Amino acid sequence: MTAPLSLFVTGTDTEIGKTFVSAAMLHGFARHGLRAAALKPVAAGAYQRDGVWRNEDADQLDAAANVVLPPELRTPFLLKAPAAPHIVAAQEGVTLDLDTIVACHREALTRADVVVVEGVGGFRVPLNDTQDTADLAVALGLPVVLVVGIRLGCISHALLTADAIRQRGLALAGWVANHVDPAMSFADENVATIRDWLAREHRAPLVGRIAHMTPAAPESAAAMLDIAALVESLRAARP
């Protein structure tokens, strides 16, 4: 039996389409014949429906997955206010515990062929007084896929984040160019520069380039991802 795959999705910033790309990957994995599940371990920003607290990002992931995990497993820490998680957690009296997330991930791996773990915000977002999302990725021991929001400043943001990933001893399994600014000048040149630098310095392949979409359509975006290349990279990144 083939061991399940898993990856940690991070971004160069917040609001650069991390959930959108994660959902697209879930659709892509399903088309690749894999049972695909999602974890959104920490979500900040909740709304109530039918007396149940929910999160829009988690809803999008559930809609894209062909294996839907129970909410308490998919998102063990659902915070109500849409703000920095360590601030909201302190206000709500919640301790964001990495061991709990690791246990949820371990259980998720028994239910799917591939588990997409979406982080919160960028690569180094504090979760408590001493740990951040980079520590979470390390605790999970997962290869990382970096979503780069293609807009002004994206080259520096991409290279800095890739360096931070390597400094934590993690493999950068690939990156996705997500065109968040349709009016950006020299978008092709920016993508080419990031592609060349990340390939040379990190051996990280470009596994997708997603055009600007209004409204966002993860199922359509899945066709813009090279899922076969991503699966190969994830397998190569296994310890």
Curated annotation (Swiss-Prot):
Record key words, sorted: ATP-binding, Biotin biosynthesis, Cytoplasm, Ligase, Magnesium, Metal-binding, Nucleotide-binding
Pathway: Cofactor biosynthesis; biotin biosynthesis; biotin from 7,8-diaminononanoate: step 1/2
Binding residues annotated for ATP, in chain numbering: E15, I16, G17, K18, T19, F20, D57, E118, G119, V120, G121, N178, H179
Reaction(s) catalysed (UniProt annotation): (7R,8S)-7,8-diammoniononanoate + CO2 + ATP = (4R,5S)-dethiobiotin + ADP + phosphate + 3 H(+)
Any one GO molecular function term: magnesium ion binding
Necessary cofactors: Mg(2+)
EC nos: 6.3.3.3
Active-site residues from the entry: K40
Keyword Cytoplasm attached: yes
Coiled-coil zones: none
InterPro entries noted in UniProt: DTB_synth_BioD, P-loop_NTPase
GO biological process entries: biotin biosynthetic process
Binding positions (Mg(2+)): T19, D57, E118
GO cellular component: cytosol
Entry-linked PANTHER family: DETHIOBIOTIN SYNTHETASE
Family as reported in the entry's similarity comment: Belongs to the dethiobiotin synthetase family.
Cited function: Catalyzes a mechanistically unusual reaction, the ATP-dependent insertion of CO2 between the N7 and N8 nitrogen atoms of 7,8-diaminopelargonic acid (DAPA, also called 7,8-diammoniononanoate) to form a ureido ring.
The protein's assembly and partners: Homodimer.
Protein name: ATP-dependent dethiobiotin synthetase BioD
Organism this protein belongs to: Burkholderia cenocepacia (strain ATCC BAA-245 / DSM 16553 / LMG 16656 / NCTC 13227 / J2315 / CF5610) (Burkholderia cepacia (strain J2315))
Lineage, uppermost ranks: Bacteria, Pseudomonadati, Pseudomonadota, Betaproteobacteria, Burkholderiales
